[in-house]
Amino acid sequence: IETLFLFTAFESIDESFDVIVTNPPIRAGKDVVFSFYEGAFKHLKSGGKLYVVIQKKQGAPSTSTKLKEIFGNCEVSDKKSGYFIFRAEKNMS
């Protein structure tokens, strides 16, 4: 398993990962956050998972919709005190 601890963009990364975990920078705006999700999809191995921690009031519904659009799936892995952890898996047939 490759590990990536901190980064802001995927442009300079040539690797693929099994898991990417993020608490996205919501204040940067939806365009930035959604672009990150698209970059994560491109950099996940087949069967790789993206985990997103996000507050309901800061875009959880639109994140769920966007992840379903990009990955074709999105599940609530956990939720507590207004926070959601979404899991999307890259399934390549």
Each model region followed by its residue ranges:
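S-adenosylmethionine
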Residues: I1-S93
